[in-house]
Regions:
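Conserved catalytic and ligand/cofactor-coordination microenvironments
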Residues: 45-59, 84, 97-99, 118-119
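Active-site region of glycoside hydrolase catalytic domains
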Residues: 2-39, 65-67, 74-497
Length: 497
C-alpha cells in the first residue's frame, strides 16, 4: 500500500506554468476531463477552463432491453440531451463513449453478450440511435473504451463482470475458458466497432461533421533486462496488448505474433470484415497511466492456456512475478520525491537529493511516496513519449487524443480536509506527462487533445470509493460536496487563455 506524506508544504497553483501552459500546445489543442458527473457539475468544469468533457452513454439506459425492438427509454434520451445541451451552453464540447463495459443484461441472458456475433448488429443499432438523437451536437464519438480491459478482466481472469474464466484459475468464476473466450469477445468487439463506424460514415458524418474513433488502454512495456529474450518478450507483450487491436484496425488482421502463438483459438476475419475493419477510425484515443517490466517466459509448458500466458511474457509490481511494476525490488518509475525550497520560496520536486544541494542551501522536506494508491500504477512519464513514437512509426501516425491520464490515492477519511486537498503528487504527475506530450508533438506525433482522469472522485470499478483519482474532492459522507484539490487549481492556472 502506497503511503503519501502530506506533511510537505503545498505547491503553488501556478507551479511550473510559466514554462508549460496552454499556449505551449498547438492552437486548437483540446484540454478536457472525464468521469461521471451531474448536470450541475458543468459549471465547475467551465470554471477550470476546460474545453471538453468526456463521458459515456449507458446502453441499457436508452435501450433497456438492449435492442430497438425492445423499445427506447425516452427518459434516458432526455437525460443525455440535457447534459449535452448544458455542456454546449457552457462552451464545452462533448466527447462521447458508446460502450464502457456495461452490456445490457437482457443481451447477456439471451445470447451471452459479446461471446456471440449477434451483438454486432445490436450494437450497430444502438450506435445508430445515438448518432440520430445526439449527433447534431456531438462531434467526437468513441465506440469502445478499453476493449482489452473488458475482454481480459471479464473473460480471462474473471475479476470483472461477467466474471468468466477457466476452472484452473480458481477465481470462483461463473464458467468460461481463459484460453478462448477473451479472443472471441475481442473479435466481436472489433466487429461491433467497425459496424458502428460504418453506419456513422454512411448515414451521418457528411451532415453532422463529426469524427469517430476508439479508445485503447496502453502501457509502455520495458524489457526487464538487456537480454535479447527479454527484449523480444517486451515486444510480444506489446503485440498482445496494443497490437491485438491496432493491427486489425490498421491492416485488417491480427499480427503474426498472435497468429503464431494463439493458433486456431484466434478467430479469423472474412475478406469483407477485414475490409470494413481496416482504417475504421478517424482518431485513436489512448488511456495511459503507467508502464511495466516484461520478462521472457517462453519455456511455459502451455498446459493451462489463457490469454495472459499466450504471449510467453510475464509482466512484473514486485519481484515475485505477480502483475507488477517492480523488478527485484526496483520500481519501474521514480518512486520517491524530495521537495526543495529556495530562498525565493519557489518549490522544486526532484527524485535526487543531490539536485537539492545544487539549487539550494536550504532544507529538504521529508520524501513522499511516488507510487499511486493503486498497486498497478507506478509513475513512468517518459513512457507516454516512447509509446506515442512507437504508434507513430508502427501505425502510420494517426490522430491521437490522450483520453485518460491520472493518478489516484487511497481514500482516507481520517485526514483533515486541508491535507486531502493538498495533492502535490498529482500536480507533478500531470505536469510531467504533459511536458512529454508537448515534446512529442514538436517531434511530429499528431496528438490533438488531453483528458485528465478524473474531474471528480468517483466509483472506481473494483476499488469502489476507496480509490480517488479526482482533481476535485467529493465528500461521500456529506451530501457529495465538491472541493477543488490543488491539482484543480493548478489546471485552472495552466489553462488560462
Amino acid at each position: 500500500m502506497a503511503i503519501i506524506d502530506r506533511t510537505s508544504a503545498p505547491l503553488s497553483p501556478s507551479y511550473g506554468t510559466n514554462a508549460l501552459n496552454r499556449t505551449s500546445f498547438p492552437k486548437g489543442f483540446i484540454f478536457g476531463a472525464a468521469s461521471s458527473a451531474y448536470q450541475e457539475d458543468v459549471s465547475i468544469m467551465k470554471g477550470m477552463g476546460l474545453d471538453a468533457y468526456r463521458f459515456s452513454i449507458s446502453w441499457s439506459r436508452v435501450l433497456p432491453r438492449g435492442k430497438l425492438s425492445g423499445g427506447v427509454n425516452e427518459e434516458g434520451i432526455k437525460y443525455y440531451n440535457n447534459l449535452i445541451d448544458e455542456l454546449q451552453a457552457n462552451g464545452l464540447d462533448s466527447y462521447v463513449t458508446l460502450f464502457h463495459w456495461d452490456v445490457p443484461q437482457a443481451l447477456d441472458e439471451e445470447y451471452g453478450g459479446f461471446l456471440n456475433p449477434k451483438i454486432v448488429n445490436d450494437f450497430r443499432d444502438y450506435a445508430d440511435l445515438c448518432f440520430q438523437r445526439f449527433g447534431d451536437r456531438v462531434k467526437r464519438w468513441i465506440t469502445l473504451n478499453e476493449p482489452w480491459t473488458f475482454a481480459v478482466t471479464g473473460y480471462d481472469d474473471g475479476s470483472c463482470a461477467p466474471s468468466r474464466c477457466s476452472d484452473w484459475r480458481q477465481n470462483n468464476c461463473t464458467g468460461g475458458d481463459s484460453g478462448l473466450e477473451p479472443y472471441i469477445v475481442t473479435h466481436n468487439q472489433i466487429l461491433a466497432h467497425a459496424a458502428a463506424v460504418d453506419v456513422y460514415k454512411k448515414k451521418y458524418q457528411a451532415t453532422q461533421n463529426g469524427l469517430i474513433g476508439i479508445t485503447l488502454v496502453t502501457k509502455w512495456m520495458v524489457a526487464a533486462s538487456n537480454s535479447s529474450v527479454d527484449r523480444r518478450a517486451a515486444q510480444r507483450a506489446q503485440d498482445f496488448f496494443l497490437g491485438w487491436y491496432m493491427d486489425p484496425l490498421t491492416t485488417g488482421d491480427y499480427c503474426r505474433t498472435m497468429r503464431s502463438l494463439v493458433g486456431n483459438r484466434l478467430p479469423k476475419f472474412t475478406a469483407q470484415q477485414a475490409k470494413l475493419i481496416k482504417g475504421s477510425m478517424d482518431f485513436l484515443g489512448l488511456n495511459y497511466y503507467t508502464a511495466q517490466f516484461a520478462v521472457d517466459k517462453s519455456s511455459s509448458n502451455g498446459v493451462n492456456q489463457s490469454y495472459t500466458t499466450d504471449s510467453h511474457a510475464t509482466l512484473l509490481i514486485n519481484c515475485n512475478e505477480s502483475v507488477s511494476g517492480e523488478l527485484n525490488g526496483v520500481p519501474i518509475g521514480e518512486k520517491v520525491w524530495h521537495i526543495c525550497i529556495l530562498a525565493t520560496s519557489e518549490v522544486y520536486l526532484t527524485t535526487k537529493l543531490t539536485f537539492c544541494g545544487l539549487i539550494s542551501k536550504l532544507h529538504t522536506l521529508p520524501s513522499i511516496e511516488h507510487q499511486a494508491g493503486s498497486n498497478w500504477l507506478y509513475v513512468y512519464p517518459k513512457g507516454v513519449r516512447l509509446l506515442l513514437h512507437y504508434i507513430r512509426k508502427k501505425y502510420n501516425n494517426p490522430i491521437i487524443y490522450i483520453t485518460e491520464n491520472g493518478i489516484d490515492e487511497v481514500s482516507n477519511s481520517t485526514l483533515p480536509l486541508h491535507d486531502v486537498l493538498t495533492d502535490n503528487f498529482r500536480v507533478m504527475y500531470y505536469r510531467r506527462h504533459l511536458s512529454y506530450i508537448q515534446r512529442t508533438i514538436k517531434e511530429g506525433v499528431d496528438v490533438r487533445g488531453f483528458f485528465a482522469w478524473s474531474i471528480f472522485d468517483n466509483f472506481e470499478w473494483n476499488s469502489g470509493y476507496t480509490s480517488r483519482f479526482g482533481v476535485n474532492y467529493v465528500d461521500f459522507k456529506d451530501g457529495l460536496k465538491r472541493y477543488p484539490k490543488l491539482s484543480a487549481q493548478w489546471f485552472k492556472v495552466f489553462l488560462q487563455k
